[in-house]
Amino acid sequence: MAVDTTAEVKAIARYIRMSPHKVRRVLDQIRGRSYREALIILEFMPYRACDPILKVLRSAAANAEHNEGLDRATLVVSQAYADGGPSLRRYRPRAQGRAYQIRKPTCHITVAVAPEITEE
């Protein structure tokens, strides 16, 4: 399966309130798959990370169709990765006037799609 990376189109969701480690677990399942196959996988996986990834994947496909004129049926997930974003810091009160810091991680999800080249 050959992919034309020169016509690669991507979409990015930034500051998603989720751990990048948990998002990567789902992204590993769809990387290299066709657009339709990735949609089906994300629809039926039980993880919370699937919703924002599904949104980004649909956005990338819409960008490919609208901006580049590509057909959704030929698209393949060429890249899918999650980078860490800034952590939100919250404080939890503890005994005797102390406070512990709670870090709430965020991440940036990037999904790139490219058309599959049919070899003749």
Curated annotation (Swiss-Prot):
Keywords linked to the UniProt accession: Ribonucleoprotein, Ribosomal protein, RNA-binding, rRNA-binding
Where does the record locate the signal sequence feature? none
Keyword rRNA-binding tagged: yes
GO MF annotation list = rRNA binding; structural constituent of ribosome
Q: Which PROSITE patterns match?
A: RIBOSOMAL_L22
Which InterPro entries has this protein been placed in? Ribosomal_uL22, Ribosomal_uL22_bac/chlpt-type, Ribosomal_uL22_bac/org-type, Ribosomal_uL22_CS, Ribosomal_uL22_sf
Describe its assembly. Part of the 50S ribosomal subunit.
Write out the function statement from the record: This protein binds specifically to 23S rRNA; its binding is stimulated by other ribosomal proteins, e.g. L4, L17, and L20. It is important during the early stages of 50S assembly. It makes multiple contacts with different domains of the 23S rRNA in the assembled 50S subunit and ribosome.
Listed name of the protein: Large ribosomal subunit protein uL22
What is this organism's lineage? Bacteria, Bacillati, Cyanobacteriota, Cyanophyceae, Oscillatoriophycideae
